[in-house]
């Protein structure tokens, strides 16, 4: 029986591969079902012989308790976006300046959810969401319910791959029809449906919804030399790989490919929102390297957003956490990119003036980045004596006079006691990317503020069960959960706290870069502007904003109150040594190294505090030149940049 179970498992897995990966079914559905039922019967009788990669392990359901955080061994970066041919040409120019013979691989940008799959000796161990690129969620049990993801590879490799999970248009339509019949809320679009499915706690639901995948990258080290070779290897290993891609050195041919794909976009069985262009050589990719946010060797061309006409009925003005007052248009409802849109941003007062937008105008509405509804411009041919929009002079929340600084495009409320400003600041502090206080959303924050329980973020840590119980709709169990979430947030790493403070220009990635150097929030109270500006990826604007914030007496008081409440001030990641020999220097490696390989040299430079980049520019501080160094060495000499050799590096 053990032998027969093995035969059936291998046979069914091959049929599944033919169907899902090669798109060439090699057996009828009835024959497949017959073999499948035989395997199920045998496995029930001999459970000790069930194999890890059995197709029966991908059906049925398990109720999960939740999803654990998962730290990616290899960070998953986002891509730089491009919206025009000019931006693609600029990318091409940057790459060709370093590598004149570079070729590109253009691939479809699938509109789904980015996933990471890790295998050990050929067996699937972990499936995770991208998250913020460093930390995602472990969704392995749900990943196993996606039929075209192999549980066992065709070779016993230890490998981590990246791809996109998506829902086909056909599956999306069928699911929404079922939800409509059952009186359930329909999904807005296939991407939202896929996202909701991957976060299901009932794995049977995941199996039923028939997600699919396309894999496109080996994020762990690979023996392949070219990206097109990586795609071929992924297909050989049993993954689904998108068949549409083009290899070329010509941006003209890339543009023709983009236009061809855009024209047939609606004929595909799944949603795409653009084309990704990658340098095909993996060695060139390594030399080009990364910015803080994205690889320098790839760019994502986004298709133009869908546009619709709508009428502006009224405008709401709201105050954000930094005091910026943002206008939002209320519109006649329109269907846009799979959702009903009745509100759209007008950005700021300068934008309204530039476009001459008025109440009652018919306007063109689109989704910026296919996400945020925005007003593009006015359909002037349909204007009929609409009145010029009145720009508020007073804050809609506190009544203070609004200011319009010369160097800004927005109106701003500068009253630190403005109720909306305080509430938005509290909401931001509790948000997922900041302190991640589960349950403490806008509605609860508003109730706490109006009840007088919170006036700044430190007050959150003084809240009691009795405080919550006084709020409408809060029962004892909810109060206990909120207090537990608040207590749990105290142990967050300090970069989440720094981001949560809502300092202008200090985002989540910048917060991490700052704490990698300073290590502790308290150290920022005495940090110097010029020191902060030296940190790789930052600059004078960020440095000025940070020092101005922490120079305020109120900042020192707030930090002290948070510390007294038990909130962690320390960065839990690996700290950068600001006293290191090469701290803050931008270094380029070029030529052949004899004693160190390139990764070893890069690791040593980064350990010494340097930022390693792939191109020489005026911003380069140092070039490490090996033998046969070419154009980069010559450029460094012409710019008067310091040049050292491998022996010098080894002696540091």
UniProtKB/Swiss-Prot annotation:
Its cofactor is Mg(2+); Mn(2+). It comes from the Bacteria. This is DNA ligase. SMART domains: BRCT, HhH1, LIGANc. It catalyses: NAD(+) + (deoxyribonucleotide)n-3'-hydroxyl + 5'-phospho-(deoxyribonucleotide)m = (deoxyribonucleotide)n+m + AMP + beta-nicotinamide D-nucleotide. Belongs to the NAD-dependent DNA ligase family. LigA subfamily. It comes from Streptococcus pyogenes serotype M3 (strain ATCC BAA-595 / MGAS315). NAD(+) binds at residues 29-33, 78-79, 107, 130, 164, 278, 302. Its EC number is 6.5.1.2.
């Amino acid at each position: 029986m053990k032998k027969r179970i093995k035969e059936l498992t291998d046979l069914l897995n091959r049929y599944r591969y033919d169907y899902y990966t090669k798109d060439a079914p090699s057996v009828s559905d009835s024959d497949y079902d017959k073999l499948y039922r035989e395997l199920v019967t045998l496995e029930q009788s001999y459970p000790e012989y069930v194999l890890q990669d059995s197709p029966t392990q991908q059906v049925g359901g398990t109720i999960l308790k939740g999803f654990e955080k998962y730290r990616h061994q290899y960070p998953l970066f986002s891509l730089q976006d491009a919206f025009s041919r000019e931006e693609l040409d600029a990318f091409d120019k940057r790459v060709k300046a370093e590598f004149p013979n570079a070729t590109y691989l253009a691939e479809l940008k699938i509109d789904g959810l980015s996933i990471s799959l890790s295998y050990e000796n050929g067996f699937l161990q972990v499936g995770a969401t991208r998250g913020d690129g460093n930390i995602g969620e472990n969704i392995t049990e749900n990943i196993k319910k996606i039929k075209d993801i192999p549980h066992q590879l065709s070779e016993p490799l230890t490998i981590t791959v990246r791809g996109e999970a998506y829902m086909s248009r056909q599956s999306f339509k069928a699911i929404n029809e079922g939800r409509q019949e059952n009186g359930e809320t329909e999904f807005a679009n296939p991407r939202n449906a896929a996202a909701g499915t991957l976060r299901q706690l009932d794995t049977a639901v995941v199996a039923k919804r028939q997600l699919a995948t396309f894999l496109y990258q080996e994020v762990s080290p690979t023996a392949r030399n070219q990206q097109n070779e990586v795609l071929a290897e992924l297909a050989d290993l049993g993954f689904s790989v998108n068949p549409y891609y083009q290899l070329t050195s010509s941006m003209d041919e890339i543009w023709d490919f983009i236009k061809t794909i855009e024209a047939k976009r609606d004929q595909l069985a799944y949603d795409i929102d653009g084309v990704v262009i990658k340098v095909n050589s993996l060695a060139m990719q390594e030399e080009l390297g990364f910015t803080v946010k994205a690889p320098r060797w790839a760019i994502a061309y986004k298709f133009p957003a869908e546009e619709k006409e709508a009428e502006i009925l009224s405008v709401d003005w709201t105050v954000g956490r930094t005091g910026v007052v943002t206008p939002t248009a209320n519109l006649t409802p329109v269907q846009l990119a799979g959702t009903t849109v009745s509100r759209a941003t007008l950005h700021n007062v300068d934008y309204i003036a530039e476009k001459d937008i008025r109440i009652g105008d018919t306007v063109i509405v689109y989704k910026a980045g296919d996400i945020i509804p925005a007003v593009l411009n006015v359909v002037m041919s349909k204007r009929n004596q609409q009145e010029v929009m009145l720009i508020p002079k007073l804050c809609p929340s506190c009544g203070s006079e609004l200011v319009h600084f010369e160097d800004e495009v927005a109106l701003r409320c500068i009253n630190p006691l403005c109720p909306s400003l305080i509430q938005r600041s509290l909401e931001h502090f509790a948000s997922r990317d900041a302190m991640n206080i589960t349950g403490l959303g806008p509605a609860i924050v508003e109730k706490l503020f109006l009840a007088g329980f919170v006036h700044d973020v430190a007050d959150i840590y003084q809240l009691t069960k009795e405080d919550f119980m006084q709020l409408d709709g809060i029962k004892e169990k909810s109060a206990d959960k909120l207090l537990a979430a608040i207590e749990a947030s105290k142990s967050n790493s300090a970069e989440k706290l720094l981001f949560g403070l809502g300092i202008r220009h200090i985002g989540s990635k910048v917060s991490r870069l700052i704490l990698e150097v300073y290590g502790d929030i308290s150290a920022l109270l005495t940090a110097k502007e010029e020191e902060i500006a030296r940190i790789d990826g930052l600059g004078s604007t960020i440095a000025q904003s940070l020092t101005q914030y922490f120079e305020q007496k109120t900042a020192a008081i707030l930090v002290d109150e948070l510390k007294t409440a038990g909130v962690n001030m320390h960065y839990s990641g690996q700290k950068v040594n600001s006293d290191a020999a090469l701290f803050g220097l931008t270094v380029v490696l070029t030529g052949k190294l004899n004693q160190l390989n390139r990764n070893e040299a890069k690791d040593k430079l980064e350990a010494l505090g340097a930022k390693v980049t792939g191109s020489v520019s005026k911003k380069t501080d140092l070039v490490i030149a090996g033998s046969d160094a070419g154009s980069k060495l010559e450029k460094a000499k012409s710019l008067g940049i310091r040049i050292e050799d491998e022996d010098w590096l080894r002696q540091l």
